[in-house]
Amino acid sequence: MTEQVDATMPIQFTDAAAIKVKGLLEEEQNPELKLRVYVTGGGCSGFQYGFTFDEKVNEGDFTIEKQGVQLVVDPMSLQYLVGGEVDYTSGLEGSRFFVKNPNATTTCGCGASFSV
């Protein structure tokens, strides 16, 4: 497990995302849960982002702690997310976690899939 807490982090975890995760964990009443972000093949642009809650941190996972909650990324996914930012938005279009990814050369209209 690798944990970094300075500006050299390969991926950022915004306050908005951390605050939302904290609220969801309080609803679940399980402080052991962490937000895991991952990349899989699929979607209309070749790769897609996924988000899930996970109690486990695997060997080699990258973790960031903010607002008392953790974001976890597996090593394979991290290579596609370096320089990116995990954020949360809520508005007229709904509420969702999303990734701002500078490595994505194209994205689909909803922002859930990308290509590099």
UniProtKB/Swiss-Prot annotation:
One of its GO terms (molecular function) is 4 iron, 4 sulfur cluster binding. Homodimer. The lineage of its organism: Bacteria, Pseudomonadati, Pseudomonadota, Gammaproteobacteria, Alteromonadales. GO terms for biological process: iron-sulfur cluster assembly. Iron-sulfur cluster binds at residues 44, 108, 110. Required for insertion of 4Fe-4S clusters for at least IspG. It comes from Shewanella frigidimarina (strain NCIMB 400). Pfam families: Fe-S_biosyn. HAMAP family: Fe_S_insert_ErpA. This is Iron-sulfur cluster insertion protein ErpA. GO terms for cellular component: cytosol. PROSITE patterns: HESB. PANTHER family: IRON-SULFUR CLUSTER ASSEMBLY 2 HOMOLOG, MITOCHONDRIAL. The gene is erpA. Keywords: Iron, Iron-sulfur, Metal-binding. Belongs to the HesB/IscA family. Binds 1 iron-sulfur cluster per subunit. Its cofactor is iron-sulfur cluster.
